[in-house]
Design a protein with these regions (language model features):
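ATP-binding pocket architecture of kinase catalytic cores
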Residues: 1-19
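Active-site activation/catalytic loop segments of kinase-like enzymes and analogous catalytic loops
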Residues: 102-144, 159-174
């Protein structure tokens, strides 16, 4: 995948999206909704992380400035097809806040958190994939760090994004993976 094209797609959406002030309660409400949907069987594993995220949310400014506008909503590599050297995006998804930040979060779900590796059940060179993803993630991080909203809100959006997957996790391995990734984010 030519990551440059995906970055350009997101950046064009940022540039065409007006910076809009939203109430932090929109994010807090989504967090509470996600928290309530966590499988009771796994809930105890996530209590500390949930508490830390809630503290972080409560400390945020009441008004949050984000670009609101075009957003794919689920821009993971599994929703990107390459045909005749052109990128085709599939499986668009509504987001709780239509912001290009969500697309950065979803890209980094793959590059930083290696989500799509969980979906591969064939033999592959995981070490090589991890090296490539680390390179791509660094590129994405460096590129979007120029935006205040990215530096300010990426972590909390990524935490909510990963928590959102937990209710769908049936496998203990996936639950532990998500727990570890959330712990890493909490340390930043």
């Amino acid at each position: 995948i030519k990551i440059k094209y995906l970055i350009e797609f997101v950046d064009e959406n940022i540039k065409s999206s007006p910076i809009t002030v939203i109430d932090k309660n929109v994010i807090l409400k989504k967090f509470k909704e996600v928290e309530e949907n966590i499988n009771k069987r796994f809930f105890d594993k996530f209590v500390n992380i949930l508490n830390l995220i809630e503290i972080k949310l409560n400390r945020m400014s009441d008004n949050i400035s984000l670009p609101l506008g075009l957003c794919h909503g689920d821009l993971t590599f599994s929703n990107v097809l390459v045909q005749n050297e052109k990128i085709v995006l599939i499986d668009f998804l509504d987001s709780f806040i239509e912001t290009p930040l969500q697309d950065i979060v979803k890209l980094r779900q793959d590059t930083s958190h290696l989500w799509s590796l969980n979906l591969i059940h064939k033999e592959c060179d995981r070490t090589k994939i991890k090296i490539i993803m680390k390179f791509l993630d660094s590129y994405i991080e460096d590129y979007f760090s120029k935006y205040d909203f990215y530096r300010e809100y990426y972590l909390i959006f990524q935490q909510i994004n990963l928590l959102r997957i937990v209710p769908y996790a049936k496998d203990e391995k996936i639950v532990n993976y998500l727990l570890n990734e959330l712990k890493k984010l909490g340390e930043k």
